[in-house]
């Protein structure tokens, strides 16, 4: 399994979070895609034990508003 930032496949942006470290929102969102654990790191949700078949940030098809 990999680890990485949770990505919104429609925008290419990370899932934003403000409460760093232990973060219920990130834990829930990471578990939703089948990851083992999540926390807020650098204002984005970081997932551990990320399923290999799920996309993570950066998402090649979408640039999150950057050119």
Swiss-Prot record:
Tissue expression from the record: Expressed by the venom gland.
Domain of life, source organism: Eukaryota
Modified residues (Cysteine amide): 64
Protein location: Secreted
GO terms under cellular component: extracellular region
Record GO biological process: defense response
PROSITE patterns according to UniProt: LCN_CSAB (PS51863)
InterPro entries given in the database record: LCN-type_CS_alpha_beta_dom, Scorpion_toxin-like, Scorpion_toxin-like_sf, Scorpion_toxinL, Scorpion_toxinL/defensin
Disulfide bonds: 13-64, 17-40, 26-45, 30-47
Keyword terms: Amidation, Disulfide bond, Ion channel impairing toxin, Neurotoxin, Secreted, Signal, Toxin, Voltage-gated sodium channel impairing toxin
Propeptide stretches in the record: 65-67
GO molecular function: sodium channel inhibitor activity; toxin activity
A Pfam family of this chain: Toxin_3
Domain LCN-type CS-alpha/beta: 2-65
Signal sequence residues: 1
Record's function text: Beta toxins bind voltage-independently at site-4 of sodium channels (Nav) and shift the voltage of activation toward more negative potentials thereby affecting sodium channel activation and promoting spontaneous and repetitive firing.
Record-stated family: Belongs to the long (4 C-C) scorpion toxin superfamily. Sodium channel inhibitor family. Beta subfamily.
Record text about domains: Has the structural arrangement of an alpha-helix connected to antiparallel beta-sheets by disulfide bonds (CS-alpha/beta).
Protein name, per record: Toxin Cex8
Organism: Centruroides exilicauda (Bark scorpion)
